[in-house]
Amino acid sequence: LRLVTTTRSQNPISERWPDMREAGIGCLDAAAAVGRDPFKSAVRLWMEKTERHDLLQPVDPSLIQSAATAAYWDRLLEPIVAAHYALRTGRQVKRTRALLRHPQHPWMLALAGREVVGAPDVQLLECRCVGMDEAELWGAGLPDYVRIQMLHRLAVTGAKTIDVAALICGQDLRIHRVERDEVKISRLIDAEREFWHCVATDCAPLA
């Protein structure tokens, strides 16, 4: 795994990441930035990045750690998904707590996440927990918006391959592979650059 310019801090990355997200486009922002996220529009993402919180629906702070949210179960089950990926594939997985920034495109950010150690064919692992409301999108394979997110991560990290281990509805573990594609990454960077120009110039993207 070749890591590009890395930002580190003594503070836990989970505490710093909400602030850092406003300084660039993260992996989970990528599909929304290019208008391909079924759950978030480019306009909403722009409002978040430009801190137009008065235009966004308020989020109840008590729900952030609530067991009623998908994010809660994601955080809880991700280590289990990673462990079962290692068990099924026989590969060693190591978590890396580093925030990365692309050297040529400083607005492109990504968490290093999990690294697959000593495997010649894959370098990174992404773990997802897919609930009932999202499972249909995974019926035909890896959803397009997730593939875009993974291409963003490959672009920032410099890695060639990432496996996506997705636990569907708590009982069906599926593994999808995303290979580095320079043509698609170049197009993604161009589209993300246009979005970030909208953020930098405080001009909303087209709906």
What residues fall within each predicted segment?
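Nucleic-acid nuclease catalytic cores
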Residues: 71, 84-200
